[in-house]
């Protein structure tokens, strides 16, 4: 799970490393950071380390936006169908027609979130900056948040980092100095 540990995200991060109990008495486990030295010092040692903190600044945000754009452009990302299409498809089935309203809402929620992500992305535009090498996005209408886009972009960034780590590990394991040639038959 990726958390922006700048600004308000610090409060969320602080709470994530502590066990939580809700009003009904249900206890939720604490989770730890795998990459943040500050949290590694203060979080309990025995908790699952599934959190990844990003402290985004102007340069990193530019790289994150560029990566998201690249992955969208080259077809690396596939989205669910939008909420309206999913609702029509679901109601066209007998199973969907027999669902209670609550079941239907639960089943369509991922599609609703996809639709909201599209709306947020449509509300963003490139912002002119003095440094033309940086990608900066601004909201066209400030009433619409960009939280889902940010979560999407940070997730894509973390995927890129994991892929790069795997590639480096694979490259490191190959025999140094030995060329690996692959031959194909003509066709």
Regions found by a protein language model. Give the residues of each.
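Mg2+-dependent endonuclease catalytic cores in nucleic-acid-processing enzymes, primarily RNase H-like
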Residues: 1-128, 183-187
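Flexible domain-boundary/linker segments
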Residues: 18, 85, 138, 168-169
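Structured alpha-helical bundle/scaffold domains in large eukaryotic membrane-trafficking regulators
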Residues: 24, 80, 133, 163-171
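Acidic two-metal-ion nuclease catalytic site recognized across multiple nuclease folds
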Residues: 127, 145-187
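Short, solvent-exposed helix-loop connector elements
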Residues: 130-142
